[in-house]
């Protein structure tokens, strides 16, 4: 009966109240987008916050940990650093540790990664013929984390009905909530 109460509240609103609530919802969404874009500029990363999706980095990071990233051009990549990188042809970025660095005479740096919980390096994950990653492949470097808070994101991706139910309820709450 909880959802019916929400619908009754929406029906009882006059047009002005409903318009105000829709605008309020729009302000919340646009504020979230502005905060995200601001974080992108400050951190230099296209994705300043990511969720660890697998157990390949255990015990350092667990599935569902939320990572905060930076990607400043002037900072050199070092062995032992945890980086988030994209592989051509794959949509989801990977969180792994830098295992080796290969520096050419011209100063161009390439590096090899490996998950802490994996037996072998990541060459099998890279696109065919690629043996090293380059700076352009890096989304960011881990600078901090919050344990397990990202499990909500994993649940929403694994169970789409759960995601739509949560989004629907949040939207209804914003529309019905009166200040």
Swiss-Prot record:
The active site is at 56 (charge relay system), 96 (charge relay system), 122 (charge relay system). The C-terminal short (CTS) helix is essential for catalytic activity. It may be accommodated as a transmembrane helix in the thinned membrane environment of the complex, similarly to the signal peptide in the complex substrates. It is an enzyme of class 3 (hydrolase). The chain crosses the membrane at residues 17-36. This is Signal peptidase complex catalytic subunit SEC11A. GO terms for molecular function: serine-type endopeptidase activity. Residues 1-16 are cytoplasmic. It is a single-pass type II membrane protein. Keywords: Endoplasmic reticulum, Hydrolase, Membrane, Protease, Signal-anchor, Transmembrane, Transmembrane helix. One of its GO terms (biological process) is signal peptide processing. It comes from Mus musculus. InterPro entries: LexA/Signal_pep-like_sf (IPR036286), Pept_S26A_signal_pept_1_CS (IPR019758), Pept_S26A_signal_pept_1_Ser-AS (IPR019756), Peptidase_S24_S26A/B/C (IPR015927), Peptidase_S26 (IPR019533), Peptidase_S26B (IPR001733). It is found in: Endoplasmic reticulum membrane. One of its GO terms (cellular component) is signal peptidase complex. SUPFAM superfamilies: LexA/Signal peptidase. Its EC number is 3.4.21.89. Belongs to the peptidase S26B family. Component of the signal peptidase complex paralog A (SPC-A) composed of a catalytic subunit SEC11A and three accessory subunits SPCS1, SPCS2 and SPCS3. Within the complex, interacts with SPCS2 and SPCS3. The complex induces a local thinning of the ER membrane which is used to measure the length of the signal peptide (SP) h-region of protein substrates. This ensures the selectivity of the complex towards h-regions shorter than 18-20 amino acids. Residues 37-179 are lumenal. Residues 165-176 are annotated as: C-terminal short (CTS) helix. PROSITE patterns: SPASE_I_1, SPASE_I_3.
């Amino acid at each position: 009966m909880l959802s019916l109460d929400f619908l009754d509240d929406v029906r009882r609103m006059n047009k002005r109240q409903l318009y105000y609530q829709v605008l309020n919802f729009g302000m919340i969404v646009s504020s979230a987008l502005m905060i995200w874009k601001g974080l992108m500029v400050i951190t230099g990363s296209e994705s300043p916050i990511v969720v660890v999706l697998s157990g390949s980095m255990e015990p350092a990071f667990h599935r569902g940990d939320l990572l905060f990233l930076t990607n400043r051009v002037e900072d050199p990549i070092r062995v032992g650093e945890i980086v988030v990188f994209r592989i051509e042809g794959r949509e989801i970025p990977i969180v792994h540790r830098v295992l080796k660095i290969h520096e050419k005479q011209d100063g161009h740096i390439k590096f090899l990664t490996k998950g802490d919980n994996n037996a072998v390096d990541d060459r099998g994950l890279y696109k065919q013929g690629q043996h090293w990653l380059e700076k352009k492949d890096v989304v960011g470097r881990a600078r901090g984390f919050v344990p397990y808070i990202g499990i909500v994101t994993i649940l929403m991706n694994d169970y789409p009905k759960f995601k739509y139910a949560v989004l629907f309820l949040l939207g209804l709450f914003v529309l019905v909530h009166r200040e």
